[in-house]
Amino acid sequence: MMGVSRHRAIGVDTENVTRSPASMEMAEHFCSRNEIAQLRSELDENRQSERLLDFWTLKEAYVKARRMGLSIPLNQISLSLPGSRGIEVAFDGSVHDHGDNWAFWMLRPSADHKSAVCVARSPGTTLAFAVRSAIPLVMHQMITSAITRKSE
């Protein structure tokens, strides 16, 4: 998966959902307190693992957009996935950022993969987001059903 942006920072991360499931032990290392509470409220281990992978993928996209690598403490980024389609983000003061500065999308490009995209926002501008399947110099087509969640 590749992201293209004109004049804006962009980060993209893709994870294979068929890998061994993520665990709560793993969550203790990179999740915020709020995220851990959300994970614990999930009764089903499969749902916990799925949500944990959502958090990881979104955080990786953000870190890539910021171009600071893992020097950003991931447990200081707090994500919430309200309803069935929303994404909200908040940052601890040590991250020196604000959730309104970023737009997020989650996608399901295939049955075995989930992806996240993070793009810097500018006040007073609207972001256009499109997903395409492409084989360079051969074909490309829009994909509309891949987007599963987005920030407002």
Predicted segment positions?
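Core catalytic alpha/beta fold that binds nucleotide/phospho-ligands
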Residues: 1-152
